[in-house]
């Protein structure tokens, strides 16, 4: 298959997932791999990917978990076209489908309360505190609009079955907002920091800039903070634990449900 000049062909999970994506603007890197690794899906379960982009997280999850089914919705039509190509490229047509849709008015086939798990990589940036990117695709992917994080949380909760899980990756400085939006609607929240370096290495330790958050819809169990994952060693290389997830398809274990 020929690749257009403005489209690159990349791989994730050590070549297990092939990905065509825009050469400019927002590009899938490690975040969708980490997100997919944290979803506790099993064979035969249905998963919704909210804001699916070019299908990176959906395909990583489907590659890791045999026989799970993943549907995704994405606002940008051009990304859905690429996602559909990526589904074919990875021979996942029987288990992965990405559709055009928005959170306020999802496609009719995305029925509320029908998914065992919902995953999302919401826009990271609050427009009140950040300047928008001049690139439209990157701006849409990275900058909140409309109902902001509340719209994303409302949609994810609505789509999950009672007792189903919501898994998100987000900036650590948005954690207060996420937790307040989940209050009394989902519990058993797990906060899993993504550390740039080993947090116990005094010479290199830095605060976690991103976290993975998992919650169970309808639960009232207390919130837990896990040890998280150190992404890099002192030399700037991926740690063995990060390599296992990013290149070898290992799951991120956030604790029992």
Label every PLM stretch briefly:
Residues 2-42:
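Class I SAM-dependent transferase core
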Residues 20, 97-99, 190-192:
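General small-molecule cofactor/ligand-binding pocket signal
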Residues 24, 146-199:
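Conserved Class I SAM-dependent methyltransferase catalytic core
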Residues 35, 121, 152, 215:
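Residue-level signal for inorganic ion chemistry
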Residues 38-134:
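Conserved SAM/SAH cofactor-binding pocket of Class I
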Residues 47-50, 86, 115-117, 178, ...:
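Structured catalytic cores of enzymes that bind and process phosphorylated ligands/cofactors
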Residues 122-152, 158:
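Mobile active-site "lid"/loop adjacent to the S-adenosyl-L-methionine
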Residues 202-257:
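SAM/dcSAM-binding transferase cores
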């Amino acid at each position: 298959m020929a690749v257009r000049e403005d489209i690159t062909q990349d791989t994730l999970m050590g070549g297990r997932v092939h990905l065509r994506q825009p050469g400019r603007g927002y590009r899938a890197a490690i975040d969708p791999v980490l997100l997919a690794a944290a979803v506790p899906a099993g064979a035969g379960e249905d998963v919704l990917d909210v804001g699916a982009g070019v299908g990176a997280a959906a395909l990583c999850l489907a590659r890791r978990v045999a026989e799970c089914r993943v549907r995704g919705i994405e606002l940008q039509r051009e990304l859905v076209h690429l996602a559909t190509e990526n589904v074919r490229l990875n021979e996942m047509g029987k288990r992965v489908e990405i559709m055009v849709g928005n959170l306020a008015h999802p496609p009719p086939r995305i029925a509320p309360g029908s998914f065992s798990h919902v995953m999302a990589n919401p826009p990271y940036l609050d427009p009140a505190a950040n300047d928008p990117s001049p690139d439209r695709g990157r701006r849409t992917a990275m900058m909140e609009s409309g109902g902001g994080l509340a719209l994303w949380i409302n949609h994810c909760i609505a789509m999950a079955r009672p007792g189903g899980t919501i898994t998100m990756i987000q900036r650590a400085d948005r954690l207060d907002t996420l937790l307040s939006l989940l209050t009394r609607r989902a519990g058993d929240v797990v906060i899993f920091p993504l550390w740039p370096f080993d947090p116990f290495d005094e010479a290199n330790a830095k605060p976690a800039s991103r976290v993975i958050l998992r919650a169970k819809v309808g639960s009232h169990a207390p919130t837990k903070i896990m040890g998280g994952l150190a992404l890099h060693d002192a030399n700037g290389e991926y740690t063995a634990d990060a390599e296992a997830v990013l290149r070898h398809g290992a799951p991120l274990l956030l604790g029992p449900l």
